[in-house]
Amino acid sequence: MNNYKNELQNLKVGRFRVSPMSQARSGGGFDALVSISSGQGMASVDRVMRFTPRFRSARDAVRYARAEGLAWARAH
């Protein structure tokens, strides 16, 4: 369980803060989401991406969101 909490932590990549998360689907399974934010105050920007694969567990969804968010932040 401790590793799962580590996977949920915000990650700093350059000027971006990557926040992976999961959300339960009403029909079962989980969605993977990631928030990528930058800036401060009035100049802050937050992008939220929801990915199409359905996951069997919240942990798997968070792992996927984390990997995708890190890849996006490193590419930008």
Spans of model-derived segments:
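A short local loop/turn or secondary-structure capping micro-motif enriched for an aromatic residue
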Residues: G27-G29, R54-F55, A73
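Structured alpha-helical
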Residues: R63
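N-terminal segment of the canonical double-stranded RNA-binding domain
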Residues: M1-G39
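A short, exposed loop/beta-hairpin motif centered on an aromatic-Gly-Thr core
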Residues: D46-D60, E68
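Short acidic, glycine/tyrosine-flanked loop/strand segments centered on an H-E-D-like triad
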Residues: Q40-V45
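Short arginine-rich
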Residues: A67-H76
